Amino acid sequence: MGQTKSKIKSKYASYLSFIKILLKRGGVKVSTKNLIKLFQIIEQFCPWFPEQGTLDLKDWKRIGKELKQAGRKGNIIPLTVWNDWAIIKAALEPFQTEEDSISVSDAPGSCLIDCNENTRKKSQKETESLHCEYVAEPVMAQSTQNVDYNQLQEVIYPETLKLEGKGPELVGPSESKPRGTSPLPAGQVPVTLQPQKQVKENKTQPPVAYQYWPPAELQYRPPPESQYGYPGMPPAPQGREPYPQPPTRRLNPTAPPSRQGSELHEIIDKSRKEGDTEAWQFPVTLEPMPPGEGAQEGEPPTVEARYKSFSIKMLKDMKEGVKQYGPNSPYMRTLLDSIAHGHRLIPYDWEILAKSSLSPSQFLQFKTWWIDGVQEQVRRNRAANPPVNIDADQLLGIGQNWSTISQQALMQNEAIEQVRAICLRAWEKIQDPGSTCPSFNTVRQGSKEPYPDFVARLQDVAQKSIADEKARKVIVELMAYENANPECQSAIKPLKGKVPAGSDVISEYVKACDGIGGAMHKAMLMAQAITGVVLGGQVRTFGGKCYNCGQIGHLKKNCPVLNKQNITIQATTTGREPPDLCPRCKKGKHWASQCRSKFDKNGQPLSGNEQRGQPQAPQQTGAFPIQPFVPQGFQDNNPHCPKCFRE
């Protein structure tokens, strides 16, 4: 890239010097870096461009067309290239005549050499004098009578004209005459714009260099410090300094500063200082009216409210979102909230938005809840101290005073905010077709359902069924513990009623239940079963009551009162304690009748009864006894083997 820039700079050195001096004479400064970038793009997409350069306006128009074609094909053209091309094209327009265009090669050869050598010098006076002597005089004097300064100003300073909202006015009110063949009388034309002979004749007169200077209303003025910005916002940057006063004669007398738009700026400043930043938002806008007859000085101008309807694209997006996701889906709630808080919506806007997006049944629900919310808000307005002068007709956009769009556009900001809150609340209560809103008591957490999902369902149901915000918060905090599964309840129980003031209870519950149901939680539950320790480090104890003494913490078989009673009963019934070890298990001093051991001292299992009687013979049952089967050969008393004994 460095080699390419150096090649471009050496290739178009004289032409670059000429362009820079030409633009500088016109009051525009362009850096060499930007010019090199421009010629790099020109060399890439316009290979026909001559090395010696050209001053033909047709060639520069052709460059613009080819760069546009390259941009349409996907090539990236930097913005600085377009700016520099437009400035050079505008600077060359005054020098075009009906004759053939002038090329840099038409100038004397010494001009090109001197311009190339002297551009490296730091002295600005020497550069300007060389330019005036060799280039500026023969070129600029050739078409002095065809200079259109209005067009040049409009092209070079388009952004400044847009900010002021006014076209170029170089002549004051008293001098607004059509230009003739000569822009100025002969006596007022700078010396450098006269033919070269005049320069030689007037040797005693000091040369006055031409330099275009914008009128006063187009000069840069630093912005004032911000007095109505956001809290803590630093003052606006001052930017660069205003243009210095040029040491040359002005081409035109200074025009009076434009006052167009100043009334609007004063109204905007006043409204912002009063905190009314929403008065200028879409779709209702306020525009200043011209002062009428008899208006006094200092009196604020009247404003006219103008209404602009919603775009078709916005209504289409709302309709598709409601159809695809539902009116109360997170996407639709976010979209509706951004529209409501980003624009100044009047009752007519809410009605159009609901009619175009919702089905007939859903719109009927919206209208019903809207009217219900208006009645509640009117009661609050009347009970306020002092009462708020906003009635039901204004909040609904009906009646003789608020039925038209022009009347609703003049509503106060407080009424706009109340309409917004009521309509958002009514939208949240819309139910999908075929679905019913369950009670918050029936919303319970599943055994494997994550706790945040359960809380989200609970909040959604509570928001639709409970209107009061404080009551809704209390109900959600209560049901978030009562309707949770046992695992989450055990994790939340230590936090119940102990959350510090200022902290969100639901957020603390969600943190406590984080990880429940995962592998880590299952491993901890297994460790609890083995060690008898819960998550909080407390020892697991039996929570029921003993059936013997009624105490909590042990079972009946382990009841100390029952064991003490058994020992007392044995001592009173027998009159003496066991003399020796138990004859049954041989490992305890107790009577054999009270032995409950299942193993003896050697670890052998003990049966229920230690001593059993002799086994009894089987008894015959039935009317006919069963004869045993005796094989043949064994029927005699002395059977003999057929192999060992013979008859």
Curated annotation (Swiss-Prot):
Residues 165-264, 598-641 are annotated as: Disordered. One of its GO terms (cellular component) is plasma membrane. It is found in: Cell membrane. GO terms for molecular function: nucleic acid binding; structural molecule activity; zinc ion binding. Its main location: membrane. It comes from the Eukaryota. A lipid is attached at G2 (N-myristoyl glycine). SMART domains: ZnF_C2HC (SM00343). Gene3D superfamilies: 1.10.1200.30, Human Immunodeficiency Virus Type 1 Capsid Protein, Retroviral GAG p10 protein, Zinc finger, CCHC-type. Transmembrane segments: none annotated. Belongs to the beta type-B retroviral Gag protein family. HERV class-II K(HML-2) gag subfamily. This is Endogenous retrovirus group K member 8 Gag polyprotein. It comes from Homo sapiens (Human).
